[in-house]
Amino acid sequence: MSSQTVARIPVVDFSKADCLKPGTSSWLSARKDVCRALEELGCFMAILPSKVPPELHKTIFNAFDELFNFPVDTPDNPLRAGYVTSCSGQNTFGIINGTNPQETQEFTHLFWPNGNDQFRETADLYAKVMAEIDEAVTRMVFENYGVEKYHDDHFRSTFYYLRLIKYEVPKKLGVDVGLRSHTDKTFSSILHQNHVTGLEINTKTNEWVVFDPLPSSVIFMAGDVFQVWSNDRVRPCRHRVTLKENEVRYSFGLFSLHKGVIHVPDELLDKDHPLRYKPFNHLEFLRAQKDLSETEYAAKAYCAI
């Protein structure tokens, strides 16, 4: 009788109090799981019960209901600056430097001139938690590859783009594509969503695995720039969104960008891992995307040797 292994998205438990403290046994255990997941699939689900409690989850997505009901889609509306809509039914607000409380406050004031402390404080807290996870995960990877001495400089050059995303109820369940198959042009991406499924992850064997979220979880995904930095050790996470439920799908995402030049550390080069990428400026890379084929892994098309 033959058996078939069903691919699953790896889960890393960050519930222990010292799991984000470098050098502890919990840290070292999580580091092993994180690196294995990023090398094999390019992503993992992080469980964060103490940092993302159910009441926080409920608060942020209740606020989304109000936020996305504001009439922003008019040509003369100043709110359009951070608003994107698409024919696939995806609507997005974006905040540059989204971990800066001042930026969140200014964004909040555009919609609620008299203030909305609950939304602002909850969005700030989510951004803070996600940035903390991003710093910890990248530090784990740097440590694992023996280049931890570069991590502080790397993190100082990191800034974040915060996105608030709504997928409308699909016209045809299981057929409508909310987001086509792609890899992110980031160093890393972290998403937290409501209960409505739709995010699917592509495996090395070209299977599509559905991400089944928990209220206390986020999904960490490696982007193209992480792949370049690691000289192909880390797999960029190819993913898509297929709308299969008769409900609105909300997602809250933090995307890490790098100010300056990305290059492969010398320590990651050996006879089995020759240099595969030229140094490149991340922001220039983003500006060049309109000239690259959407079917390619963008980093390989842009700076592969």
Summary of predicted features, one role per range:
Residues 1-305:
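Peripheral, non-catalytic segments flanking oxidoreductase cores
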